[in-house]
Swiss-Prot record:
Superkingdom assignment: Bacteria
This protein's name: ATP synthase subunit a
Annotated gene: atpB
Annotated organism of origin: Prochlorococcus marinus (strain MIT 9215)
Cross-referenced HAMAP family: ATP_synth_a_bact (MF_01393)
Assigned protein family: Belongs to the ATPase A chain family.
Amino acid sequence: MFLNSLLTNFAALEVGQHLYWQIGNIRLHGQVFLTSWILLGALLVFISLGTKKMENDPKGLQNLLEFLWDYIRDLARTQIGEKVYRDWMPFIGTLFLFVFVSNWGGALIPWRLIKLPSGELGAPTADINTTIALALLVSLSYFYAGLSNKGWRYFEYYVHPTPIMLPFKILEDFTKPLSLSFRLFGNILADELVVGVLVFLVPLILPIPVMFLGLFTSAIQALIFATLAAYYIGEAVEEHH
């Protein structure tokens, strides 16, 4: 009886349940848009409160926001370089904050308590469509960075230091977004599934330290994603000699 009950509970942990929105011939994952809008709205409110009354001696939310600004500035300067890092700070900062808030929102907010006609809510970054879209955005960004800074000379990168590297450099353009998207998706989805399984097995105590570990992992994944995005952009604008 216990085994049957346990298997029934595990069966409830389905992966890939979706609320679909049909717009013409396009079918969208509605739950991703809902959670993204909620989290982005919360982030905008947080930033608005922190910048409402700017003071020379920052404290509270303003102090936290200035710390994040300084951290993102240092990250962008280190990875992209002194020359153009300022142009890319808003992009890198937005990526970091969106991934961070999405990851933590999935770990802290009990989305499953909100009932939908079909599917269930969860972290936007636990959906492969979100992470692939973010990774493709990064790819377009470093192509744009290279072309806008070097023009057609950017394509010299593909044959540097020798033309033998051409097929490997082309392959790299495909593996970069794949690694970015699947790393983030896999880690966040795995964290949600592990916590879900433990809640079924021991719902009172054991899931709590695992949730704290998930929060730490989620923050690290946001940092890795933003750092790699900045690194790829820096690689695109770097002058080869």
